[in-house]
Amino acid sequence: MNIGVIFAGGVGRRMNTKGKPKQFLEVHGKPIIVHTIDIFQNTEAIDAVVVVCVSDWLDYMNNLVERFNLTKVKAVVAGGETGQMSIFKGLEAAEQLATDDAVVLIHDGVRPLINEEVINANIQSVKETGSAVTSVRAKETVVLVNDSSKISEVVDRTRSFIAKAPQSFYLSDILSIERDAISKGITDAIDSSTLMGMYNRELTIVEGPYENIKITTPDDFYMFKALYDARENEQIYGM
């Protein structure tokens, strides 16, 4: 069984959206979160979707599920106090749906430019190696800095990747790590791959498209609109 856990728990302070969380902003009559879920909905390999939503917008999210006929969404749950705790709540909901050896794909609700090919590659990577971290090759040089803002290391660009999403694992594995981490007071890991790395788990890269952006700022929003229109018009992709 393959389950998408889609995190839509942010409130979008950097988007200046005057109260509406960024995941609910509309592009061509459809909220960003629905654009994202649609990809999972239309991917044959996905059996179910769990949406983790900011608590004050649960009813709104449930209405979107009904309005857009998102039949693979089997649960909409409230997020936690941190991103990690929100994902944990989504994983717990997935556990209620799962069969043995379920694969879970943890994805950002504001990454609507994912595609079926990457989703399928994530599932295959988990089955072969136990993990999948969707990533892109770094286009520019990455440097590490110290507390004095001095460069302490220049990272070899040929070995540098930027981690994105989905980040995918066997559900039982990530839940086991989450529960142990929480029991030790670790509740704010930046993402699931970071948490798994803290436990020295082997992580495998799945290369994804550069356009798999996370919509965080107004610039990101307008970039998504442009890329979406380009896809729709078939003027750029596939050339």
UniProtKB/Swiss-Prot annotation:
Signal peptide: none
CDD domains, sorted: CDP-ME_synthetase
Reaction catalyzed: D-ribitol 5-phosphate + CTP + H(+) = CDP-L-ribitol + diphosphate
Single GO molecular function: D-ribitol-5-phosphate cytidylyltransferase activity
Disulfide pairings: none
HAMAP family: TarI (MF_02068)
Name this polypeptide is given: Ribitol-5-phosphate cytidylyltransferase
UniProt source species: Streptococcus agalactiae serotype Ia (strain ATCC 27591 / A909 / CDC SS700)
Taxonomic classification: Bacteria, Bacillati, Bacillota, Bacilli, Lactobacillales
